[in-house]
Swiss-Prot record:
Any one Gene Ontology molecular-function term assigned to this protein's record: dynein complex binding
Keywords: Cell cycle, Cell division, Coiled coil, Cytoplasm, Cytoskeleton, Microtubule, Mitosis, Repeat, Transport, WD repeat
GO BP terms, alphabetized: cell division; establishment of mitotic spindle orientation; microtubule sliding
InterPro entries: Dynein_regulator_LIS1, G-protein_beta_WD-40_rep, LIS1_N, LisH, WD40/YVTN_repeat-like_dom_sf, WD40_repeat_CS, WD40_repeat_dom_sf, WD40_rpt
Domain writeup: Dimerization mediated by the LisH domain may be required to activate dynein.
Name under which the protein is recorded: Lissencephaly-1 homolog 1
Superkingdom of the source species: Eukaryota
Coiled coil: 51-87
Organism: Paramecium tetraurelia
Length: 403
C-alpha cells in the first residue's frame, strides 16, 4: 500500500497515541524511529481516524445494498416485469424523514452540507454553530464565538473552512480541522443576514441589515467592494453560476442583479408584494431544461433565478432579460427557502405554513406536499445529493431521504 507523506505522518501519529495509553517505552521508541514531532501530534487523531473508518464502513454497506436493489430492479425492468408511471415518479420525490437532530436552545436559522464529508452544519439564534454526522444523526461539535444570533453559514469548496454570519455585526471564518476561528471580518453596521463562498473559495459575499452587500477577500480579510442600492434590509445575496453577477433581495420587495466588476445594477426585478426572503440561482442543467421548455433555446445565458417571498409566492426570473418567466403559488404562509433536486427539474420549498412542497419546474406545477413537517415555522432547507435538510423555529433540524 502506497501512502502519501501526509497520510504516513498521520498514521504514525495515531499509532504513537495508541502506544502512549499502555506502552510508554514502546511509544518513545516508536516516536524516535518514526520521527514523530511533538508539534505534529493532533489531539484525538486516533479516535477521529477510527470513527472515520466506522462511518465509511457503514456507508460502504449501505451503498452495496443500494447497488444490489438497483441491479434487481434493472433485471426486472429488462425482463418487462416493471411498469413505470407518473405515480412512481411522485412516490420517488416524497421526502422520507430519517433523523430529527436536537441540541440547539433556540430557533435554527440555517443548515449547510460539507462538500466532501458527511458533515452538516447548523446555525441558531442561541449564538452557536453545531456540526452533525448526517449519516448517523450524531452530534459532533459546537463552535462558539459569536455574541448574538448566528443567521447563516457556508462551507468553502475545499471543506477546510466554514464561515458564519451573525447579528453581532461580524462574519467569522472557522478552520474545521481544529474547530477554531481563524479570522473575523468587520465592516457591516448591522446584523449580517447571509454569507456565501465563491466557487474557488477566494471571496465571501455577505448581505446585511445595514442595506449593503459586501465582497470580501478571504486571504486578507479585507472588503474589496460594497454594493449599495437597496432601501431596506438585504435578506440575501448570491453569486450567479458564472460568478460575473450577484443577485440580492431585500425587505424593500426588490431583487437587484449586479455586475460584479463595475458594481452597477444591471436589473431591478419587481413583482413581489412583500419582503423577498431568499434568492437562489438554478443549477445549469436545470436552467437549460427550463429554457428548452420555455422555447428560449437561443438565449445564451443559463443564469435563471428563483426568489421566495412573504407574499407566499415563488418566482423564476431570467436575469439577462430581467423578466419573470413564471410564478408558483400554493403555500399558505411566508415562503422562506428553496433547494434543487439533483435531477435539475424538481425544487423543494419550505414555509411558515410548516409544509415541504415539491415542484416540477418544467411543468410549473406542485407535485407533492408534506404537511406538518415541523412543529413550527420552517426557515431554510438544503439538499446534498439525496439527503434533504430542514431547520425550524422549533429548535430542530430534520434530515429527509430523497430518491
Amino acid at each position: 500500500m502506497v501512502l502519501t507523506a501526509r497520510q504516513r505522518d498521520e498514521l504514525n501519529q495515531a499509532i504513537h497515541q495508541y502506544l502512549l495509553i499502555s506502552y510508554q517505552q514502546s511509544a518513545q521508541l516508536f516516536k524516535t524511529e518514526a520521527a514523530v514531532k511533538d508539534g505534529q501530534i493532533e489531539a484525538d487523531l486516533l479516535e477521529k481516524k477510527w470513527n472515520s473508518i466506522v462511518r465509511l464502513s457503514k456507508r460502504v454497506i449501505t451503498l452495496e445494498q443500494q447497488v444490489e436493489q438497483l441491479n434487481e430492479q434493472l433485471a426486472q425492468a429488462q425482463a418487462g416485469k416493471i411498469q413505470f408511471n407518473k405515480s412512481d415518479d411522485e412516490q420517488r420525490l416524497t421526502p422520507i424523514e430519517k433523523f430529527k437532530l436536537e441540541g440547539h436552545r433556540a430557533g435554527v436559522n440555517c443548515v449547510a452540507f460539507h462538500p466532501q464529508y458527511q458533515i452538516l452544519g447548523s446555525a441558531s439564534d442561541d449564538g452557536s454553530i453545531k456540526l452533525w454526522d448526517y449519516e448517523s444523526g450524531h452530534f459532533e461539535k459546537t463552535l462558539k464565538g459569536h455574541t448574538s444570533n448566528v443567521n447563516c453559514l457556508a462551507f468553502d469548496p475545499t471543506g477546510k473552512y466554514i464561515c458564519s454570519a451573525s447579528s453581532d455585526l461580524s462574519i467569522k471564518i472557522w478552520e474545521l480541522k481544529n474547530h477554531t476561528c481563524v479570522k473575523t471580518l468587520i465592516g457591516h453596521e448591522h446584523s449580517v443576514s447571509t454569507v456565501q463562498f465563491s466557487d474557488h473559495g477566494d471571496f465571501i459575499l455577505s448581505a446585511s441589515r445595514d442595506k449593503n452587500i459586501k465582497l470580501w477577500e478571504v486571504a486578507t480579510g479585507f472588503c474589496k467592494k460594497t454594493f449599495s442600492e437597496h432601501q431596506e434590509w438585504v435578506r440575501c445575496a448570491v453569486f450567479s453560476n458564472d460568478e460575473k453577477q450577484i443577485a440580492s433581495c431585500s425587505q424593500d420587495q426588490m431583487i437587484y442583479i449586479w455586475v460584479i466588476d463595475s458594481g452597477q445594477v444591471l436589473h431591478q426585478l419587481s413583482g413581489h408584494e412583500h419582503v423577498v426572503e431568499q434568492v437562489k440561482y438554478i443549477p445549469e442543467h436545470g436552467a437549460k431544461q427550463i429554457l428548452t421548455q420555455q422555447q428560449q433555446q437561443n438565449i445564451q445565458t443559463i443564469n435563471l433565478l428563483v426568489s421566495v417571498s412573504r407574499d407566499k409566492e415563488i418566482k423564476i426570473w431570467n436575469t439577462i432579460l430581467g423578466t419573470n418567466l413564471f410564478t408558483l403559488s400554493g403555500h399558505d404562509n411566508w415562503v422562506n427557502g428553496v433547494s434543487f433536486h439533483p435531477d435539475g427539474v424538481h425544487m423543494l420549498s419550505v414555509s411558515d405554513d410548516k409544509t415541504i412542497r415539491v415542484w416540477n419546474l418544467k411543468e410549473q406545477k406542485q407535485k407533492k406536499k408534506i404537511e406538518n413537517a415541523h412543529d413550527k415555522f420552517i426557515l431554510k432547507c438544503e439538499i446534498n445529493k439525496f439527503i434533504f435538510a430542514t431547520c425550524s423555529v422549533d429548535q430542530t433540524i430534520k434530515l429527509w431521504l430523497l430518491s
